[in-house]
């Protein structure tokens, strides 16, 4: 059952975040999308951009204050679409940790402190803190960081190769079409739609759920078929 809701999103100006915002706005029950950004963006209907310094020591507190205001108008869910994707090879592990754990962790804590119950987290296929591979390991550490915040509902999205994305080279998408299962291709619009569906349909459920490619595609198709 759908209900009126708002979403507060970090990373909404990126490729995947933009797809999630578009799918949320396509849902009539979404009253507002609040985007935390580092700089001002062009005005859009039902979108409120709030400029915050994500690297500031009080970022969590400022997020909490913002979230409380949005919650005063009705149900709110939080979304993190932060990620560097294919650009991760150019980042040091320290830089990745500062973004994926530091910034995302502070955002999550602020949302939780404000009283938001549902958090949607963009991760990556195979994410585990025990991995030998740096990017996958950092994704797993990010999941653990948000998990430890204690949301009543945590939805983790683990896409494989994201296509329809300016950051994904064509040859990588071709390679992904040959890879079966959770590490293969998924279109960013489907990923965004599955996030919108999670918020619209499952915000009042409890517990943690992890969705990989097949589950995201199924949920997005179900959501798309509902008038």
Where are these regions (language model features)?
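A structural signal for isolated positions on well-ordered beta-strands in alpha/beta enzyme cores
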Residues: 6-8, 32-34, 119-120, 155
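Short, polar loop motifs at secondary-structure junctions
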Residues: 35-42
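N-terminal Rossmann NAD(P)H-binding glycine-rich loop of SDR-like oxidoreductase domains
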Residues: 2-29
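Conserved Rossmann-fold NAD(P)-dependent oxidoreductase catalytic core, especially the SDR/UDP-sugar
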Residues: 84, 90-140, 148, 155
